[in-house]
């Protein structure tokens, strides 16, 4: 595909998204009808689409509200002359109209790419870091790997990845690598397929390394999902690991991932929790707005509404209340989100466990200024009989 044809394909996908389809569904629909598109073409179209959605507010200001307008704005923001790609030749988009040829007299403003209703809250919550964080969220997120130190060391993993054409660099955290070249080859690499590495953001790796996990005993990942944090805990503790999720299908891949990593983990249904409790530590990485991951999942910020944020707050409080009942006296409760919002972080803990006799241990926050996703972590402990009732 020519560069112009890729832009035309991105316009079609964006129009489908603006009509209500998810980005993934729109991309899949395009790919099925574009059998001529190679893997590099599909990757390029996907990048164009995600870049435009990530900066939808500014792209619209610089080009228009349609798929064509968003791509026109994206090219202008990138400093690329759109007329070089909007030629009408072959499969390229039609040439610019007289109106489109004149760029709008506007300045780039990163806050345009935050939903308007959320801007005052985000500015207040992020305080002096608000502007630089919102600016950082304009750009693609880096990809990080966690080295499975049970099976390999960083040097061995780097050598293996290089053989598959994947270049990485070390980070300040031992056992974490940043992928800087050929990230799309990763899932077919020997290191990934044999469990030497897992894809995991740096903030999550730092958080899991910072928690005071019990060295033995029993640890429950209450909102396990795919089990990334369950596997990370195994690098930090010899405790027996248990995983639970309110939607069990989310854990479908966990047994295979654990086996590949050489880790034993027991999956529990909700009805099984009481007879396996109590646990020495319970981790709750609760469902949230995902505002800390909007670089990676830009569609999510445009889906979020005030009502949905309020629903999430209620759900988070219920999960914390339910999960805290499973912690042994003197045990540890670990609360995590990938949110930048105080309403999903400090406010949840203040409204639940702090009012019920728990002691607040270290709280940590990570943002894109730390070269990672936005992430929140707090640990809590109860010194005696745990009071978790309403």
Give names to the regions the model predicted.
Residues 1-390:
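S-adenosylmethionine
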């Amino acid at each position: 595909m020519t560069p112009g044809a890729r832009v035309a394909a991105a316009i079609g996908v964006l129009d489908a998204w603006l009509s209500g389809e998810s980005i993934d569904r729109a991309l899949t629909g395009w790919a099925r009808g574009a059998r001529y598109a190679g893997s590099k073409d599909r990757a390029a179209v996907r990048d164009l689409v995600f870049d435009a959605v990530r900066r939808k507010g500014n792209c619209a200001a610089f080009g228009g509200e349609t798929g064509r307008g968003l791509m026109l704005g994206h090219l202008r923001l990138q400093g690329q002359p759109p007329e070089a790609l909007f030629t009408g030749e072959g499969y390229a988009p039609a040439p610019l109209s007289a109106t489109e040829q004149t760029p709008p007299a506007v300045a780039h403003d990163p806050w345009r790419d935050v939903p308007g209703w959320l801007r005052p809250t985000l500015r207040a919550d992020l305080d002096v870091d608000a502007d630089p964080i919102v600016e950082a969220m304009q750009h693609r997120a880096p990809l990080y790997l966690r080295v499975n130190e049970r099976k390999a060391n960083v040097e061995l993993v780097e050598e293996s990845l290089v053989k598959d054409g994947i270049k990485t660099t070390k980070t300040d955290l031992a056992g974490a690598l940043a992928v800087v070249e050929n990230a799309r080859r990763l899932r077919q690499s020997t290191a990934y397929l044999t469990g030497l590495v897992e894809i995991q953001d740096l903030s999550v790796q730092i958080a899991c390394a910072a928690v005071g996990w019990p060295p033995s005993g029993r640890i429950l990942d209450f909102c396990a999902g795919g089990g990334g944090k369950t596997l990370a805990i195994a690098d930090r503790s010899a405790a027996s690991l248990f995983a639970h999720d309110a939607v069990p299908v989310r854990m479908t891949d966990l047994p295979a991932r654990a086996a590949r990593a050489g880790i034993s983990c027991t999956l529990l249904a909700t009805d099984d929790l009481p007879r396996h409790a109590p646990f020495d530590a319970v981790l709750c990485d609760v469902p949230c707005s995902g505002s800390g991951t909007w670089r990676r999942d830009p569609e999510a910020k445009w889906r979020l509404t005030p009502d949905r944020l309020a629903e999430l707050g209620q759900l988070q409080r219920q999960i914390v209340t339910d999960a805290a009942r499973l912690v042994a006296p003197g045990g540890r409760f670990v609360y995590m989100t990938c949110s930048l919002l105080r309403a999903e972080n400090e406010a949840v803990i203040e409204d639940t466990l702090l009012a019920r006799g728990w002691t607040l241990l270290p709280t940590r926050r990570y943002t894109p200024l730390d070269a990672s996703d936005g992430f929140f972590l707090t640990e809590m402990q109860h010194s005696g009989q745990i009071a978790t009732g309403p």
